[in-house]
Amino acid sequence: MQKQTLPLVFINLDKDSERRTRIEGQLAHLGLPGERLPAVWWKHLPPAEQSLLYSAERNHGLYYQPLVDGEKGCYASHIQAWRQLLASDAPALVVLEDDVRLTPQFADVVNAIAALQ
């Protein structure tokens, strides 16, 4: 199997150590290196940063209901991952949630994507 060359991160809240252990075990089992990306806890963000990331008014015009804090934190965590990619020289970034269940074929898929470079 070709060595995976795409960076891979998993989003994980500081308090969820069991989830971290589980995803790290799955990645190790598949032979994939992964880096923990600390998840954003929405309530801990300063209001000024919250307003840069989310607008209740814009959301209301586009969707049926406002996002709850957990959804906003998830969204902000993914933005953090995009920023990490943009700050790097990598052509792509694999972003996982810490509660994902990886299939045995996942490493092959990542390697196939990496081979497209």
Language model features: what each stretch is:
Residues 1-96, 100-117:
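An acidic/histidine-cluster motif and surrounding catalytic segment
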